[in-house]
C-alpha cells in the first residue's frame, strides 16, 4: 500500500501527490490518515498527482496530511447480512444496530452484463394501482420511471409501489435514497417496519446534506447490493429516489474537476454517466432486477437534458401532472402522457389493450372538447359528445385511488385493486353500464363495486 500526501483542497475535490512509480489507478479508494474520510481517484494529473473526490465531509483536512492507497475500488457489504439495515455510500451501518457482519464485500464499479447474458421477459408485474396497471403496465425485470415536478407525489407513489409490490412479492428489495430529504428516509424506514417487510429490504442512504461525491456513488452502492441478490438467482426490486439528484451530483463533481459544462450547465459526460448506472440495472439468465426510479423534472420541463436522458433507458414511464394534482385527483398520473412498452395486445391481451386505448381516446376527446365547453357551454355539444364528456369525467375520477401509505393524510383506508377488477371497471364505464351513477361516486374508491355502493349513499 503506497502513501502520498494532500497538496490541494478545493471543497470536495482533493489533490494528492504520490511517488511517481506508485500512482493509484482511477476509481481506487484512498484513506486519509487520522481522519475518517475516504477519497476516490477521478483523474491522474501527471507528476504523481491524482485528483480525487471526497466521499464524506472535508472539514478538518489540511495540506500535508498522509493518504494511503487501498489498492482497490470502494467495496460494500453484499448478501443477506444487508437486509433490514441502513447503510451509507461506503457500506457502513448508520442505524446504530451494530456491525453488518457481512461474509462478502464487492467493489461498486462492476461491468454491465454482456448482451449474451441478458434475459428478456413479458411477465406483467401487478401493482394494485389502477391507473398504472391500466395504461402503463410494468414488466417483471423492467425499468420504470416516475416523472414529476416538485410536490406532485413521486415519493408517495414510490412508497405505495414498494408497499404493494414488496408485500405481495416474496423476494428482496433494495432502496437507494440518492440526495433526498432525511425526513423521507426516516418515514420510509418506519413505513417498512410497520408493514413487516423491513427484513427483506436493504436501505442505502446518501441524503441531501452529503457532499456531491457521496451522492454520485450511493446509487452504485445500492445497485451493487441488488446485483448480488440477482446473481444468486433471486428476483430483486431496486428503488431509486431520486435519479435527478444523481445527475446533479455529477454536475457538481464535473464543475469541481474543471470540465467545461454542456447544455443547461450539465456535465459533458451526462449520457455516459446515466448509461453506466442504467446498463447495470438489467435482468440476466440467473435472476431479474425490476427497478422503479423517481425522476424529478426541473420546472416541469420534460425536455430538460436530465429527464430526457433518463427516458431512453426506461420500459415504462409514469408521468405525474400538476394539472391533475390541482383537481385533487391522486395518484396524479397523466394517463395520456404515461406509456409502457408492455401496452401491446400480444403481451397484455386484447381486452386490456382495447380498454386502455378506449380510456385514452375518451380522455383525449374530452381534452379537445374542453375549449368548446369553456366558450359555449355544455348545451352546445351534440348528445354523443355530452355522453362522452360525462363518461370522461367518471373515468377521470375513477383513476383516483386511496393509498395505504397516505391513510394518515386522507383518513380513508388504502385500496389494492387487482388487474382483473381494474379492466372490468373501466370497460363497464366505456360501455355505458354506469351512466346512471353520479360522477362523485367514482372519486377515491377501489373497485367499481365500491363506486356502486358509494352511489347508494349519495
Swiss-Prot record:
Positions bound to ATP: 148-155
Family of the protein in this entry: Belongs to the ATPase alpha/beta chains family.
Enzyme Commission code: 7.1.2.2
Assembly and interaction partners: F-type ATPases have 2 components, CF(1) - the catalytic core - and CF(0) - the membrane proton channel. CF(1) has five subunits: alpha(3), beta(3), gamma(1), delta(1), epsilon(1). CF(0) has three main subunits: a(1), b(2) and c(9-12). The alpha and beta chains form an alternating ring which encloses part of the gamma chain. CF(1) is attached to CF(0) by a central stalk formed by the gamma and epsilon chains, while a peripheral stalk is formed by the delta and b chains.
Keyword Cell membrane appears in the UniProt entry: yes
Reactions listed under catalytic activity: ATP + H2O + 4 H(+)(in) = ADP + phosphate + 5 H(+)(out)
Function: Produces ATP from ADP in the presence of a proton gradient across the membrane. The catalytic sites are hosted primarily by the beta subunits.
Protein name per its UniProtKB record: ATP synthase subunit beta
Cellular component terms (Gene Ontology): plasma membrane; proton-transporting ATP synthase complex
UniProt keywords, alphabetically: ATP synthesis, ATP-binding, Cell inner membrane, Cell membrane, CF(1), Hydrogen ion transport, Ion transport, Membrane, Nucleotide-binding, Translocase, Transport
Gene that specifies this protein: atpD
Principal location listed in the UniProt entry: membrane
